[in-house]
Amino acid sequence: MGYNVEQQTVNRTPSTRKKTVKKVETMPETQEREVNHMDFRPKNFDQIVGQEEVKENLKLKIAAYKKTNKSVVHMLFLGFSGVGKTTMANAVANEMGVNFHQVMATRIKSWADFYNILKDIEENDIIFIDEIHALDRKIQEQLYGVMEDFTCTIEDKNLNRVRLVKINRFTMIGATTHTGKLNDALINRFQYKCQLLPYTHLELSKMVQTAGERIYNVDVPEEIALRLAQLSRKTARVAYNLLRTFMDTAEASTPGRVRSDMLTKDLMYKTLKLEQIDPIVGLDYASRKYLITLLREEKALGSRSIASMINEQESTVLNTIEPFLLSDIKLEFQKQGQIVESVKPFIKITPKGRISTESAYHYIKLCQNLQAQGWFPNESLTIK
């Protein structure tokens, strides 16, 4: 079978290009509203808080690109949901001055879907594939040639033949929470791999204060910003969502402009109560339901079983609920009349499945005390 090679060329340099962001995937309506509201997402490396080592590495690669005008190496960003993988990828495109094509892997059902993205790219563009581990194995294999030689094969049904198509050079950035689901050969084609770390409370606090200034034109008190950060489950997305709901409550509570002195602890706790977020460690309804389920079953459970029992998608359990529960969580509780401070995970993963820890038990007991004070009125928090 012969190949007919086609060449697509775009003669533009970074300085003459008008950068655009192309979100190939249509996000769920609720997420889209959230992202539109969160237009304070950092646009460049200087605006990104934390991840210093990663930023320094990326700056070096981009400096080389600007000097040689050769595409930056393909990159793989690792880290659980909410640590800023998409933000970092978008910042790379902004720093380079190139177009940013964003696609969710779950929307790529066939090679034709991916080719529709490839045929529109310009020289040195960024293609960002979120949750790249969700790509079908065959599609992962077809990426090899694209990433190495910038060529791909497409089937021409009209001419009943396969064509080898030359495409513009580009940089692929993949984001994943599960490297084990990627082909080893595909992983090896990403020349730069980096682990994005969870944010510290101080970093999240700084994000909250910066967002308050940019979006709401108000100085969020340091004490309030830090408390919101501590309840953000180590992720920027949760911190921004808490700030948004906090400011919505403040706006609804006053006829005039919200001032810094109006942002009080009482108002913050009112917001948390309305949103069913605990003031202890910041867990929401779904996370508490997860823990209650484990505690009641008193046996190891698989992620699929838990997802079914709490009426959530397994991907939500794996990528959104579990990462924080598996991390070290600071908790204070009474045990045998003594105040105990624990810094341990709420769950553990064993060969038989997920099990709850003693910390999870004491956390639910604290939530029961809150329920007696009017919190979580519609939740069943009873355990043995």
Where are the predicted features?
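AAA+/SF3 P-loop NTPase mechanochemical coupling elements
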Residues: 156-175
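Conserved C-terminal helix/linker of AAA+ ATPases
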Residues: 225, 249-276, 287, 350-351, ...
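Pre-Walker A (pre-P-loop) alpha-helix and adjacent loop at the N terminus of AAA/AAA+ ATPase modules
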Residues: 32-74, 78, 115, 119
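The conserved phosphate-sensing helix
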Residues: 222, 232-247, 283-285
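Conserved AAA+/SF3 P-loop NTPase catalytic/coupling segment centered on the Walker-B
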Residues: 91-92, 111, 123-153, 179-189
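Walker A/P-loop
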Residues: 63-103, 117-122
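Conserved AAA+ ATPase "SRH/arginine-finger" region at the nucleotide-binding site
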Residues: 177, 192-204
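Short amphipathic alpha-helical interaction segments
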Residues: 311-329, 335-339, 351
